[in-house]
Amino acid sequence: MENKWILNSGNSPKHPEFRLFCFPYSGGSASYYSGWNQLFGDNIEILPIQYPGHETRADEPLIPDVRALAEAALEGIVPDTDMPFGFFGHSLGALVAFETAALFTEYELDLPQMVFLSSAGTNFDRVQPPVHTLSGEALKKT
């Protein structure tokens, strides 16, 4: 049975030793990672995550909540965690990857060996207000 959460790029290694689930950025899609299998050799299989409302799943409604998206993705990911695995997420994908990894802990599932997060901000307080809220004069002074 085909997994709608995983984009099959058709160039996966035959006998991988590790699986890397890749979560795309907001507005992105799983096909962004379709060429990555060629970059990582025969030991690592890249499994791009396809969100509802994107590309091959464009007819499905978007899931606007990160936690709900992680919960839904978890169901699609778990069947392919039968070997060592990790997560990579970029931007919004970093948030979804982090939340999904947290769910593995919450549900006492085998944990990813690695979680790579790129270009995602933290929840720290800003020192100054965001520039889009500044008046023209205040913006000139920054």
Regions found by a protein language model. Give the residues of each.
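Domain-scale detector for complete catalytic domains at protein termini or as standalone homologs
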Residues: M1-F88, L92-T142
